[in-house]
Amino acid sequence: MKEGTIMKKLLYISVNSKPEDLSASKTVARKFINKFLQKNKDFQVEEIDLYKEHIPRLEYQYFEKRNCIVNEDDAKKLNDKDQKEVQRIRALCDQFISANVYVIAAPMWSLSFPAPLKEYIDCIMQDQKTIKFEGKKIEPLLNDKPRTMVYIQSSGGNVPWMLRPIMNKGLNYIEDIMKFMGIKKFEELLVDDTGFTE
């Protein structure tokens, strides 16, 4: 790596309370990331474990309008707890925006994914950050540079290809919401038949 080279970022988002050696999705994600880094020396990894990190639950007082967190002056009028929550939401959103490649590792739960991932997505879906409102239209803002999302999902059984649009609602949602924000390249890595305890 040449001195002065600006490093790109891979943001690894894990969504499983199990330790890595007991989680199929996290084990596969780690192998994928290690291989990726071997081939892409200009990348560094930043990790966030949604079961260990604090992900705020959104409250009405955090917003000045739809999908728009209160500005810094108004945030100072909130109590200390709420100010910290607003700061955390901003930090999560800024961290997401700064990445070039995203890897999400999650199990399929109830045809979807664990709840912390939805709470995280709610935090990063911000007006003038990842999307913008233009009249009655919503425009993506994450199409400003090449970005790629890799969604690694484990499931206990095998989901037949023809039933995936019906049964794989979590995968479909993640693909749709990422493209909604402007992340055009979406790759899926499905780890099926891990056993019904996975």
Put a short name on every predicted segment.
Residues D82-I166, L171:
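Helix-loop-strand module that forms the ligand-binding subsite of alpha/beta enzymes
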Residues V15, S154, V191:
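Cofactor-binding loop segments of dinucleotide-utilizing enzymes, especially the Rossmann-like FAD-
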Residues P19, H54, N158, G195-T197:
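Flexible, glycine-rich phosphate/dinucleotide-binding loops
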Residues K9, Q44, R147-T148, K185:
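Residues at the starts of beta-strands that form the adenosine-phosphate
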Residues K2-A106, L111-A115, E119:
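N-terminal beta1-alpha1-beta2 submodule of the flavodoxin-like/Rossmannoid cofactor-binding fold
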Residues N34-L37, P160-E198:
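Glycine-rich phosphate/pyrophosphate-binding loop and the adjoining helix
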Residues K2-G4, P140-K145, F180-G182:
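Short glycine/proline-enriched loop/turn "hinge" motifs that connect secondary-structure elements
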